[in-house]
């Protein structure tokens, strides 16, 4: 269970996010920049139409170039955990107020520091357990916010199902995502509806196992809003992702110091 007291685990995938600083010295037009798949994306088994739709989604989100240039992302996951992620370095800050818990770690090497109830955890075994927990929480919570950017991720096979309508009656194209050998629960399956009108994701369904025919849940992706140079959605129907902010720069101490941070004063885009 990743989301204790809130939800069962809905995603355990290892999401391969780019952590390299883009080359800002080269001017690249969006058409030439493209939307290349992550290494390990199952191109051979994926449908051409599904890939074309995924590329249209990326354009609607602001374009691959703007996504790659986005560095710091901050959000509150369903009122439970607050995340701040440096996409270039892999550094993450997770705060869980209900547990008086702050975790500072790096998703690439899964090392870091943890403070619980005002005291830093120094026991090696306990710290490693906390790092594993932090990583799982980040994988889960970031996918709930950033899934549409990850349609061509490593390990993903993308299939086109056909035309469909959402529960709210929106005309859409339906995709299926399955996974191979990545993450915590690679047996999961998702169906993703893409709006004919906006090319943005407007609904998803989660299946604990790829062989399941009935989803565990179906939820909307609504209220798309521009943050910085990209589009993000926090409305999942009964659940809300809030306090979404994009930063070009943040003090290094955000990722290294347990001291409280007032993100509203740090100049979100």
Specify the residue positions occupied by each region the protein language model found.
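C-terminal motif of bacterial Sec signal peptides marking the signal peptidase cleavage site
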Residues: 15-18
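Sec-dependent signal peptide recognition
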Residues: 3-9
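N-terminal mature ectodomain segment of secretory-pathway/periplasmic proteins
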Residues: 39, 45, 51-122, 161
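Bacterial signal peptide processing site
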Residues: 20-22
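Flexible, processing/modification-adjacent segments and terminal tails
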Residues: 114-186, 211-212, 254, 262-269
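Gly/Pro-enriched, hydrophobic low-complexity segments
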Residues: 169-261
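Short, basic/low-complexity N-terminal boundary segments at the transition from targeting/disordered tails
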Residues: 50-59, 67, 71, 138-144, ...
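Acidic/histidine-rich, surface-exposed loop or edge segments in extracytoplasmic proteins
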Residues: 31-41
């Amino acid at each position: 269970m990743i989301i204790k007291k809130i939800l069962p685990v809905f995603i355990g995938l290892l999401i391969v996010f780019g952590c390299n600083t883009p080359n800002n010295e080269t001017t690249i037009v969006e058409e030439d920049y493209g939307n290349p798949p992550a290494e390990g994306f199952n191109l051979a088994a994926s449908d051409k139409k599904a890939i074309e739709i995924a590329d249209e989604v990326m354009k609607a989100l602001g374009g691959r170039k703007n996504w790659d240039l986005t560095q710091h992302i901050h959000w509150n996951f369903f009122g439970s955990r607050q995340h701040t992620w440096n996409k270039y370095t892999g550094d993450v800050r997770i705060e869980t107020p209900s547990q008086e818990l702050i975790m500072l770690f790096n998703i690439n090497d899964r090392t870091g520091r943890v403070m619980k109830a005002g005291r830093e955890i120094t026991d090696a075994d306990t710290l490693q357990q906390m790092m594993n927990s932090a990583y799982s929480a980040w994988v889960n919570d970031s996918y709930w916010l950033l899934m549409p950017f990850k349609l061509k991720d490593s390990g993903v096979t993308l299939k086109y199902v056909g035309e469909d309508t959402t529960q709210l009656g929106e005309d859409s194209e339906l995709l299926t995502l399955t996974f191979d050998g990545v993450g915590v629960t690679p047996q999961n399956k998702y169906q993703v509806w893409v709006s004919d009108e906006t090319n943005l994701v407007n609904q998803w369904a989660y299946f604990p196992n790829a062989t399941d025919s009935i989803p565990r849940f179906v939820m909307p992706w609504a209220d798309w809003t521009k943050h910085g140079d990209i589009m993000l959605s926090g409305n999942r129907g009964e659940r809300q992702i809030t306090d979404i902010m994009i930063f070009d720069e943040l003090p290094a101490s955000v990722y290294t110091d347990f001291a409280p941070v007032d993100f509203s004063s740090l100049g979100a885009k």
